[in-house]
């Protein structure tokens, strides 16, 4: 009986340590933040001006102004889009996206980015910006600007 108690004293802390380490492990920089239950909806969203990667310069410029101004995106994502804005330190568990990560840019569809702007990112510090701060049209312009952070895109 003494052996079982001794084993319990070591196993419980060991199991708790494994769970804690797994929970605190850094998130993958390309990990999807749209919940699986909302993915179909996210993929159905389409920009009114066509694909965000090829948006006209005036749309991108408007998106930049919104990103750096009214939308407040730069506060967490930084002016450079690297996730290094002045408020980024407040999000230690799920840091803001690094939009310069081309793998992330290539793996995510425009509708996924728009869904996050519209609904926020559950379990992270990313809040919904539509309709509180941005209109849907403005949200799409921000997506077009975010797409410019990866210089390797086609």
Language-model segments: which ranges?
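Sequence context surrounding c-type heme c attachment/ligation sites in exported
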Residues: 60-74, 107-112, 123, 132-136
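The canonical Cys-X-X-Cys-His
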Residues: 63, 70-80, 142-146
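Gly/Gly-Pro-rich "capping" loops immediately C-terminal to redox-active cysteine motifs
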Residues: 64, 78-110, 114
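Axial heme c-ligation environment in periplasmic c-type cytochrome domains
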Residues: 25-30, 116-149
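C-terminal motif of bacterial Sec signal peptides marking the signal peptidase cleavage site
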Residues: 21-23
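Electrostatic cytochrome c docking/interface patches
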Residues: 36-68, 154
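Detector for the c-type heme attachment site
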Residues: 76-83, 103, 118-119, 129, ...
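Bacterial N-terminal signal peptides that target proteins for export
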Residues: 2-12
